[in-house]
């Protein structure tokens, strides 16, 4: 049974400031996100200190906007949740401090939420929901992991990247090609105009029986390819398309093995890269052909946001879990060690 409780959540793990309000019985009440893309564009990447300072400036405004959107007063909030890791320490500390200060001011309990658990559970916000147990593919700028998910909080890592995350690989390739920041979506857009068959690229670690990933060798291959090719627009588009095809095929091969290893029917794909249309199409096609099911977050929730944090907190409240009032943040935190204190 869904509980009628208003959860206000704070997200600040990287360069998106987020405040959301979620009620398990009534659904999404508010979701406010401010992206710092323009702030960091001139540097070609996220500057941690600038990110933390900008979060501090945005949170009061976003909170008021969220309360207005939800048509609630602050006194109607029952629980405060925040992202406590993993992420940039300064950015996390800004969000944690704001959350704890707010909780102290209105005398409400707090919940400390794992950022990637928020992503993992976000497909449950869509109308059609996965069923436990399922496989989770987490793909973002900082993570590439395959997990066995038996229940909320019961996560076993089946495989993960040994070097670059897939989102990081997209961004680095885009930067080498001179594409605007943020590069991942720009590379995917350029790939739509390219011939994905023109360049044959190595698919790292597909001949190994495990479920780990590696993208550094592919990145080096593409860098050398760019250096030896003409820099005309069509060649750039063809390289982008071939690179994207190679990454998608690599992820698909590992997901097939995870399906076979676990025997599960459902696959959940979350994180920023889950918005990639080529990846979605390939995984959906494979699932349809093999009588499996694949689930994605709504496109608006693929990036970092506070709604997924509030939503994850609602699952934790079902366990009657409330955290202490000590401010805790951590840059690294394995999902498989979620029950371990920070």
Curated annotation (Swiss-Prot):
Needed cofactors: Fe(2+)
InterPro entries: ATPase_NBD (IPR043129), Gcp-like_dom (IPR000905), KAE1/TsaD (IPR017861), TsaD (IPR022450)
Cofactor stoichiometry and binding remark: Binds 1 Fe(2+) ion per subunit.
UniProt GO MF annotations: iron ion binding; N(6)-L-threonylcarbamoyladenine synthase activity
A Pfam match: TsaD
Residue numbers binding Fe cation: 115, 119, 304
Range of residues in the leader sequence: none
Entry keywords, A to Z: Acyltransferase, Cytoplasm, Iron, Metal-binding, Transferase, tRNA processing
The EC number(s) this enzyme carries: 2.3.1.234
A biological process term (GO) from this entry: tRNA threonylcarbamoyladenosine modification
KW Protein biosynthesis (keyword) present: no
Keyword tRNA processing applies: yes
Cellular localization per UniProt: Cytoplasm
GO cellular component: cytoplasm
Bilayer-spanning residue ranges: none
Catalyzed reaction equations: L-threonylcarbamoyladenylate + adenosine(37) in tRNA = N(6)-L-threonylcarbamoyladenosine(37) in tRNA + AMP + H(+)
Binding residue positions for substrate: 138-142, 171, 184, 276
Function summary: Required for the formation of a threonylcarbamoyl group on adenosine at position 37 (t(6)A37) in tRNAs that read codons beginning with adenine. Is involved in the transfer of the threonylcarbamoyl moiety of threonylcarbamoyl-AMP (TC-AMP) to the N6 group of A37, together with TsaE and TsaB. TsaD likely plays a direct catalytic role in this reaction.
HAMAP family named among the record's database cross-references: TsaD
Protein family: Belongs to the KAE1 / TsaD family.
Protein name: tRNA N6-adenosine threonylcarbamoyltransferase
Species this chain originates from: Dichelobacter nodosus (strain VCS1703A)
Lineage: Bacteria, Pseudomonadati, Pseudomonadota, Gammaproteobacteria, Cardiobacteriales
């Amino acid at each position: 049974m869904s509980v009628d409780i208003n959860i206000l959540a704070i997200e600040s793990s990287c360069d998106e400031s987020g405040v959301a309000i979620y009620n398990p019985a009534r659904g999404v009440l508010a979701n406010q996100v401010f992206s710092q893309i323009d702030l960091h564009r001139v540097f070609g990447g996220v500057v941690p200190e600038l990110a933390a300072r900008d979060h501090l400036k945005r949170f009061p405004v976003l909170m008021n906007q969220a309360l207005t959107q939800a048509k609630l007063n602050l006194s109607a909030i029952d629980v405060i949740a925040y992202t406590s890791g993993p992420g940039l320490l300064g950015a996390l500390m800004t969000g944690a401090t704001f959350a704890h200060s707010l909780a102290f001011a209105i005398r409400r309990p707090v919940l400390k939420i794992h950022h990637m658990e928020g992503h993992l559970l976000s497909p449950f916000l869509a109308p059609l929901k996965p069923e436990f147990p399922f496989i989770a593919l987490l793909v973002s700028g900082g993570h590439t992991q395959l997990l066995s998910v038996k229940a909320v909080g019961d996560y076993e890592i089946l495989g993960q990247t040994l070097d670059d995350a897939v989102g990081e690989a997209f961004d680095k390739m885009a930067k080498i090609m001179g594409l605007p920041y943020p590069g991942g979506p720009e590379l995917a857009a350029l790939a739509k105009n390219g011939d994905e068959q023109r360049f044959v690229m190595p698919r790292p670690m597909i001949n190994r029986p495990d479920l780990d990933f590696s993208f550094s060798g592919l990145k080096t291959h593409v860098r050398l390819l760019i250096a030896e090719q003409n820099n005309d627009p069509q060649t750039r588009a063809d390289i982008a398309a071939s690179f994207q095809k190679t990454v998608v095929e690599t992820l698909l091969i590992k997901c097939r093995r995870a399906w076979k290893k676990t025997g599960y029917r459902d696959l959940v794909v979350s994180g920023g890269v889950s918005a990639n249309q080529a990846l979605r199409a390939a995984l959906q096609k494979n699932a349809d052909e093999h009588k499996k099911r694949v689930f994605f977050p709504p496109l608006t929730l693929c990036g970092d946001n506070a709604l997924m944090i509030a939503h994850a907190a609602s699952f934790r409240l079902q366990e009657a879990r409330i955290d202490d009032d000590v401010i805790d943040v951590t840059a690294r935190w394995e999902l498989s060690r979620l029950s371990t204190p920070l």
